[in-house]
Amino acid sequence: MTLDDIKEMIREIPDFPKKGIRFKDITPVLKDAKAFNYSIEMLAKALEGRKFDLIAAPEARGFLFGAPLAFRLGVGFVPVRKPGKLPAETLSYEYELEYGLDSLEIHKDAVVKGQRVVIVDDLLATGGTVYASAKLVESLGGVVDSILFLTELTFLDGRKKLDGYDIISLIKF
């Protein structure tokens, strides 16, 4: 198994979720035990030598890679969720989408001041979701060590939105 094999497994769905979008569907990777395990191993390898305390990931697809990666590396996992999904007191960050505004929330006690956090998501597109996640971590006093993606859509220039952060992506489209 190689990252090229994983890339070939990611299928493109035209006009999803709306016309003109070419959606990168990772579900074939998730359903294949060897491919999914290899993806987690390669994400773990990308973080070798780094010192951090937590992995944070935005819902929903960030959870698919962030939680197993945290388990694999023996660190805690912090979910970053849509409004109203977390039960305790939260902090919120509003961000712009192509078609309006959205927001994400994190528990106020999810990160202790000075903790180093890696943010994990499945895909870097425009960067808005992980930017909001990073701002939430920082607002709690955490330090964003790096932002890690399985895939990146380079033509959308999401790295520009994340300027100043250490960005790692394993597969580029």
Curated annotation (Swiss-Prot):
Gene Ontology annotations for the cellular component aspect, listed alphabetically: cytoplasm
EC identifiers of the protein: 2.4.2.7
Subcellular location: Cytoplasm
Molecular function terms from GO: adenine binding; adenine phosphoribosyltransferase activity; AMP binding
Name the UniProt record assigns to this protein: Adenine phosphoribosyltransferase
Pfam family, one: Pribosyltran
Gene3D superfamilies attached to this UniProt entry: 3.40.50.2020
Pathway as given in its UniProt record: Purine metabolism; AMP biosynthesis via salvage pathway; AMP from adenine: step 1/1
GO biological process: adenine salvage; AMP salvage; purine ribonucleoside salvage
SUPFAM superfamilies named in the record: PRTase-like
Annotated function: Catalyzes a salvage reaction resulting in the formation of AMP, that is energically less costly than de novo synthesis.
Enzyme kind, highest EC tier: transferase
Catalytic activity: AMP + diphosphate = 5-phospho-alpha-D-ribose 1-diphosphate + adenine
Description of how the protein assembles with itself and partners: Homodimer.
